[in-house]
Amino acid sequence: MATAVSYCLLSCIFALLVVSFASAGKDDQDKQVYIVYMGALPSRVDYMPMSHHTSILQDVTGESSIQDRLVRNYKRSFNGFAARLTESEREILASMDEVVSVFPSKNLNLQTTTSWNFMGLKEGKRTKRNPLIESDTIIGVIDSGIYPESDSFSGKGFGPPPKKWKGVCKGGTNFTCNNKLIGARYYTPKLEGFPESARDNTGHGSHTASIAAGNAVKHVSFYGLGNGTVRGGVPAARIAVYKVCDPGVIRCTSDGILAAFDDAIADKVDIITVSLGADAVGTFEEDTLAIGAFHAMAKGILTVNGAGNNGPERRTIVSMAPWLFTVAASNMNRAFITKVVLGNGKTIVGRSVNSFDLNGKKYPLVYGKSASSRCDASSAGFCSPGCLDSKRVKGKIVLCDTQRNPGEAQAMGAVASIVRNPYEDAASVFSFPVSVLSEDDYNIVLSYVNSTKNPKAAVLKSETIFNQKAPVVASYSSRGPNPLIHDILKPDITAPGSEILAAYSPYVPPSESDTRHVKYTVISGTSMSCPHVAGVAAYIKTFHPLWSPSMIQSAIMTTAWPMNASTSPSNELAEFAYGAGHVDPIAAIHPGLVYEANKSDHITFLCGFNYTGKKLRLISGDSSSCTKEQTKSLTRNLNYPSMSAQVSGTKPFKVTFRRTVTNVGRPNATYKAKVVGSKLKVKVVPAVLSLKSLYEKKSFTVTVSGAGPKAENLVSAQLIWSDGVHFVRSPIVVYA
């Protein structure tokens, strides 16, 4: 009897345990990482953010131990934490007066031997520099880490870090900083096979860091292609890296990115470059980059961000806040071309970075559709995985309707591949000989194959040319208009982003299915244009160390090379593709006038964007409030270097922009307004500005009127203020 009772009791306990474990398992599955953003740090001396965060989390979860809940604290530059929460816990936290927002931690995506010469920033003594101030400049790189042994980041010849530096070298396992690479932190989770370290396991972070501030390294090439000196915009500057991207997956969590901003600001970096972007965007208080960059701006730090790689369609821009300096990508005059010689003697010019030399030998040509017996025609034409028959492609050159799958041809024994890309405006590295052709050129090859009994071709090693039309906005570069703030023009500026040769990590091959390992390679993207502008911003700061982030941004935008619709593959998008134009580093040193917007101006902007009361005070960290006038203020009146307005396309419109300029040129200057390139009626009042002293400010209005533009189109003009020496240019954009 006792045995039966004991058995029954054990059975009941076991059943309860099963239910308990099942419930716990379900509860864990229901939890996800949320960011609890609480605004600026309170100014009270006795405020202890970590204790406060712990107390809040204990109260909401009902758990005394929150070790498994708390992911990280934000405690150095702004206030908040990341934690594993259920939906009901998220709702409770979101309702608290001391909380600005609670939003899921998402994954963000990762977005040179001649590019700096192309922009006018020449090597050596040909470019004016302030080496001592440049050496005191620190660029914070929020990315995938860095390869510290690269010559681009050597500390040889550098003195100790600047006295203002408050950071550390916490690079982790087998990682050493130096007097060039002065700081390193990492925020990535521990993954099997990857040591906990700030080392770069994707190559992306090393590439972007060297573009911005890498040392000058001579005789660099990619297997002989692009040979020259690789260097950053400010080679004497220091670098601090903040690794936020998971090794092996090339994804970057927003809770880690926010922690990187928290540290970078407190570490006293001068410029932040962040070549990351979200797939989808929300409001400002749920936008990780916007939050981090706002607090950086409040501390005098400019954040530069890539526009995104989702072009050429409109409204694909993902960097939208006005305190983020948003950079589109263009080409430069250098290009890598890969010729295809057909059996009939015709030569077709394609694009790729092909370092493989087949010695001009011609091989049989086969189309993917003809090399498959188990896929439909479309999939076979694309050389989709599992479609190609090795017996039909081995030892041949395979034509594929897309450049996404040449590796399939290689895996099946092909010696080379010819692929199609309607936007073949940026050469890529492949793991075997590939030439990427335009639609028309690809059809020429296809026609030759279909009309010839034994078609043959040769794919030659790439050549470097220097006569390419430039700058032209890259097809992949994301376009406006701004989907969140319709009256703020984005992108802001354009810089080289295509076919950039820069430092890399030898831990990862330069392309998919590649067996090679290199320390320098060629990559394209707004990830590459972003650090170019960060380097320019740092360069300007060496001449004007007291300038605010908005002054530096204005100087770059108003002195940019003018661009026009012919420099964008989607011509009708114009300024939505290139913003104010192409960056000109030398002109940006002396802009004449600047449009300055400080923290209080951005607070007024937030008032007009319906941020009021307690939430506004939490974000600002002070007693800021919105007056009735500020609440009614239009976002287009933020003192921004460009002017943009969305209007009705069905009726005449009239919009007014209010702006203020600050004289940074010369005293006793008179600037006259001129409007060029417009079908619009534009009135500037006053049309003449007399400035007696440096840093004197003058305000004016710009009123634009006309018939409503056609749907999905824009109409633009250029306002130029000139004193005969300086030409301060701002785009004016109106769209429906």
UniProtKB/Swiss-Prot annotation:
Pfam families given in the database record: fn3_6, Inhibitor_I9, PA, Peptidase_S8
Domain Peptidase S8, residue spans: 115-589
Glycosylation sites: N174, N227, N450, N564, N598, N610, N668
InterPro entries associated with the record: PA_domain, Peptidase_S8/S53_dom, Peptidase_S8/S53_dom_sf, Peptidase_S8_Ser-AS, Peptidase_S8_subtilisin-rel, Peptidases_S8_3, S8pro/Inhibitor_I9, S8pro/Inhibitor_I9_sf
Span of domain Inhibitor I9: 33-110
Domain PA: 362-442
The keyword Secreted is assigned to this record: yes
A GO MF term: serine-type endopeptidase activity
Propeptide: 25-111
PTM note: The C-terminal propeptide is autocleaved.
Keywords attached to this entry: Autocatalytic cleavage, Glycoprotein, Hydrolase, Protease, Secreted, Serine protease, Signal, Zymogen
GO cellular component term, pick one: extracellular region
Active site: D143 (charge relay system), H204 (charge relay system), S527 (charge relay system)
Residues annotated as signal peptide: 1-24
Enzyme Commission no: 3.4.21.-
Subcellular localization: Secreted
GO BP, sorted A to Z: proteolysis
Family: Belongs to the peptidase S8 family.
Entries under PANTHER family matching the protein: PROPROTEIN CONVERTASE SUBTILISIN/KEXIN
Protein name: Subtilisin-like protease SBT4.6
Organism: Arabidopsis thaliana
Gene name linked to the record: SBT4.6
